[in-house]
Amino acid sequence: MKTAIFTVVLALAVFAVLSFGWEANEKALSEEFTELIHEKEAASETEARECRYFWGECHDHMPCCDWLVCRYKWSITYNICVWNRTFPEK
């Protein structure tokens, strides 16, 4: 009887340790994934500042990308980047 109780307690202890390790690993993966997402967002924001993409608002200080042109649309103060019927060279 004592052996059975000892085995059950030992098994519970092993499961607790494994569970704690799995939870720590899961948190580390979650943090790594979050950092990766933030890095990707920062990279895309840097790209977006270089030029405005299709249907993006444009002004003199916010130029459109090479294959787009800034055109007047719907309002005097609202210009957007539209396609200039060319393709970017790779």
Curated annotation (Swiss-Prot):
Disulfide cross-links: C51-C65, C58-C70, C64-C81
Name the GO cellular-component terms. extracellular region
Q: Name one GO molecular function term.
A: toxin activity
A matching Pfam family = Toxin_12
Record's subcellular location: Secreted
Quick check: keyword Disulfide bond in the entry? yes
Q: Does the keyword Hydrolase apply?
A: no
SUPFAM superfamilies the record matches = omega toxin-like
Q: Which residues form the propeptide?
A: 20-50
Q: In which tissues is it expressed?
A: Expressed by the venom gland.
- Which InterPro entries does the protein's record reference? Huwentoxin-1
Q: Which UniProt keywords apply?
A: Disulfide bond, Ion channel impairing toxin, Knottin, Secreted, Signal, Toxin
Signal peptide stretch: 1-19
Q: Which domain of life is it from?
A: Eukaryota
Q: What family, per the record?
A: Belongs to the neurotoxin 10 (Hwtx-1) family. 13 (Hntx-13) subfamily.
Q: What does the entry note on its domains?
A: The presence of a 'disulfide through disulfide knot' structurally defines this protein as a knottin.
Query: What is the recorded function of this protein according to its Swiss-Prot or TrEMBL entry?
Result: Ion channel inhibitor.
Q: What is this protein called?
A: U7-theraphotoxin-Hhn1h
The organism of origin for this protein: Cyriopagopus hainanus (Chinese bird spider)
